[in-house]
Amino acid sequence: MKIKVIVTPKNGVLDPQGKAIQQTLNSMNFIDVSEVRQGKYFEIETELKDEKDAKKNVEDMCKKLLANLVIEDYKIL
């Protein structure tokens, strides 16, 4: 079973990579872009067959490694 996870900076946390991308896009004439937030995307293949158990396991992974809970949020898809 494949579980997908998106990790993004929390609202209010500075995102220097996102800001740099936004500024570069503006300089390339994409002037309508007012903000970019950069995050991480994970696809985790698990041998667990039960979706509920697999998502709970991936949630533990997010809390322990994949996301820095002080500055990042995560969403399991």
Where are these regions (language model features)?
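Long, contiguous binding/interaction regions
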Residues: 2-39, 53-77
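Surface-exposed aromatic
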Residues: 39-46
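Helix N-cap motif at beta-to-alpha junctions
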Residues: 47-52
